[in-house]
């Protein structure tokens, strides 16, 4: 007895869907999935959390959720803002925090500072925990402190955060957006790297510490990429042509990273993906400013006030979440300008106030692989995006 045509069609569609699901899950499971920027350490210190507890609904990340999302390599950000007193001391506090997490969870995670250790962690099915300093102010204008952070396991440093250092200017400053005490900072500083900044880049090359050009101003970018003898890392940035946020890379910069042999890892922050979000966010902040002021006056901390307001107005937060597909528009632009060998993932989870749609926390990384499969990327190219490009740059920066 022959089946009716529509029944055969339905069965074939069902098998296609099952096959596609099995395909992306297999690719994701077999890949060494790397993310080069996560701020969970500073978030845990600020909020009194610990990484190995269940933080669902409180943060984007925790240990078990990273493992559930198939993450194999996570670079943890060692971060404080430019107002932090004794930033080098705070950096060491954050490093100590990660050390303690690893010590408590030896069967689930491993501290990694070399390609050989990364391979070992992956073979043992442990999260490879790496560290990157976010902001050159944390070395306090002292190369010996840079050396010390390297010796403690730090393997990249962004030359600036949003604030300038005495030796490098930031994207926020160079674009005229830098704020100080609630007002535009009019402090005059020559753009780019000064002589000490050049020494920092050269010292990082010598140590085997990746030079990270996220957050830096245009002139600092060009000074650093022209000085560096090693491939550059851009750990968490997107494309200016698609979303003109001052933190994003212009097309000539993207091309230059490709020529340098470096990698640009995509940031998930909606305001860097979607050009409409910045205006929405400003309206949201202004609308709730009095409410936030009252909460802080009542004794709430800044982050607690933000969390309370966000919890009261979930629809407004949802309206600021960039469409998932925009991440892949940025990815494709980098591929077109620099090549498939020069793009990866640096989500900035727990360093961003809200996420894009779909990518609500670290368990959603498989959705990236699923979409790459749907868009027709080959298994080889997906592996490059998820793992190979960052690992190649990491290896290329090692001292022979």
Where are these regions (language model features)?
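Bacterial Sec-dependent N-terminal signal peptides
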Residues: 1-24
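N-terminal hydrophobic targeting/anchoring segments and the immediately downstream early-domain regions
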Residues: 21-187, 240, 244-400
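Loop-centered beta-sheet repeat module
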Residues: 189-237
């Amino acid at each position: 007895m022959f089946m009716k045509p529509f029944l055969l069609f339905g069965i074939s569609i069902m098998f296609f869907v099952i096959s596609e699901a099995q395909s992306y899950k297999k690719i994701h499971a077999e890949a060494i999935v790397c993310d080069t920027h996560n701020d969970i350490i500073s978030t845990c210190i600020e909020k009194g959390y610990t990484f190995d507890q269940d933080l669902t609904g409180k943060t984007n990340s925790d240990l078990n959720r990273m493992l559930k999302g198939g993450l194999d390599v996570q670079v943890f950000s060692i971060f404080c803002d430019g107002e932090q007193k004794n930033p080098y001391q705070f950096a060491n506090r954050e490093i100590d925090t990660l050390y303690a997490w690893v010590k408590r969870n030896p069967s689930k995670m491993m501290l990694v500072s070399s390609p050989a250790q990364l391979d070992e962690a992956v073979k043992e099915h442990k999260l490879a925990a790496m560290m990157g300093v976010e902001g050159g102010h944390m070395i306090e204008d002292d190369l010996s402190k840079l050396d010390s952070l390297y010796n403690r396991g730090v393997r990249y440093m962004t030359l600036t955060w949003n604030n300038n250092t005495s030796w490098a200017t930031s994207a926020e400053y160079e674009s005229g957006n830098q704020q100080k005490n609630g007002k535009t900072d009019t402090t005059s500083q020559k753009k780019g790297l000064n002589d000490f900044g050049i020494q920092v880049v050269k010292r990082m090359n010598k140590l085997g510490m990746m030079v990270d050009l996220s957050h830096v101003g245009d002139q600092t970018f060009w000074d650093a990429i022209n000085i560096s003898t090693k491939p550059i890392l851009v750990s968490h940035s997107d494309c200016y042509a698609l979303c003109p946020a001052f933190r994003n890379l212009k097309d000539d910069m993207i091309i230059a990273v490709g020529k340098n042999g470096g990698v640009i890892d995509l940031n998930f922050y909606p305001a860097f993906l979607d050009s409409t979000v910045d205006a929405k966010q400003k309206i949201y902040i202004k609308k709730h400013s009095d409410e936030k002021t009252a909460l802080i006056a009542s004794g709430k901390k800044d982050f607690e006030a933000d969390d309370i307001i966000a919890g009261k107005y979930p629809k407004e937060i949802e309206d600021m979440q960039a469409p998932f597909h925009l991440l892949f528009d940025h990815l494709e632009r980098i591929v077109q300008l620099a090549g498939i060998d020069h793009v990866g993932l640096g989500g900035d989870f727990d360093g961003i106030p809200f996420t894009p749609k779909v990518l609500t926390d670290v368990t959603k990384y498989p959705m990236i692989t699923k979409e790459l499969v749907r868009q027709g990327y080959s298994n080889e190219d997906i592996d490059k995006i998820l793992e190979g490009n960052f690992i190649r740059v990491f290896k290329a920066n090692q001292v022979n």
